[in-house]
């Protein structure tokens, strides 16, 4: 495998927002830049599917936004499907169309984002024997 020409590498670096790093060594990159570099390396093989393990873990709020926008951009422009493992459910809710829940190394439930949202709505259901008494409450 590999990249046949440097133009491909430049295109990938531009895609992930690392085109202007010059000769800066990766060890001197910020955590967000390292996350984007990891995604760039994975993109070198032109995948249709990428697995990301805690891609925003440890990032500052701006870094989280940048990684989220990159994932959405790659999904939309390159039609790449992502499998993301994360404990940050709020962030997943901004990205995911489907969820899988794992317990003991096994998927115990799969659900669409729409169905998950419906099942998580807060509501109270009350049943009363006397609506007149309830009206006085």
Label each region the model flagged.
Residues 58-59, 70, 114, 126-128:
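Short, charged/polar low-complexity linear motifs in solvent-exposed/disordered segments
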Residues 1-84, 89-103, 107-109:
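ABC transporter nucleotide-binding domains
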Residues 106-127:
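Conserved beta-strand-loop-alpha-helix hinge in the C-terminal portion
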Residues 129-137:
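Short amphipathic alpha-helix segments
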Residues 82, 114-115, 131-132:
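Short C-terminal domain-edge/linker segments immediately following a structured domain
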């Amino acid at each position: 495998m590999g990249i046949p020409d440097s133009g491909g590498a430049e295109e990938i670096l531009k895609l992930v927002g690392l085109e202007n790093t010059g000769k800066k060594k990766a060890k001197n990159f910020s955590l967000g830049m390292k996350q984007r570099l990891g995604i760039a390396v994975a993109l070198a093989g032109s995948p249709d599917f990428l697995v990301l393990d805690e891609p925003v873990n440890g990032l500052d709020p701006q870094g989280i936004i940048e990684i989220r926008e990159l994932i959405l951009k790659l999904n939309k422009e390159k039609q790449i499907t992502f499998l993301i493992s994360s404990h940050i459910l709020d962030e997943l809710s901004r990205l995911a169309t489907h969820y899988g829940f794992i317990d003991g190394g096994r998927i115990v439930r799969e659900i669409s984002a729409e169905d998950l949202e419906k099942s998580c709505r807060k509501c109270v259901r009350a049943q009363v024997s006397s609506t007149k008494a309830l009206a006085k409450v």
